Amino acid sequence: MRKKNYKGRCEKRSVPKCEGICKTYDTLQSRLVDILSEDDAVKEIRCNVLMEDTDYTSDIVCIMNDDTLVVYECCYRHLIKRPTTARLLQQSREFWLGHGIKEEDWRLAVDAEK
């Protein structure tokens, strides 16, 4: 999750399953986009999707071949215990569950343990 007007460094690139330019803000988000673009079950990928009535965006929203939505939030392992991170992740989860996403279709992508 990021602020909707995040001013940090981003990588702009073209991804086959993403309309227009895909903007990724860190290596975790970029790698997840690569993995999802190779997945045959994914029909479309959307990056940095604005959550209405909030100042934040969800990292990745996928439309699967059966037209269900799957939401991915990217989080680094060392940040996951922070109260602010937990609050924002909970806010994202509640937002998407309120918009018809199933519990198992809201997912958290975490970097590998070192």
Predicted regions: what they are:
Residues 1-114:
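Electrostatic, structured charged patches in enzyme active sites and in nucleic-acid/phosphate-binding
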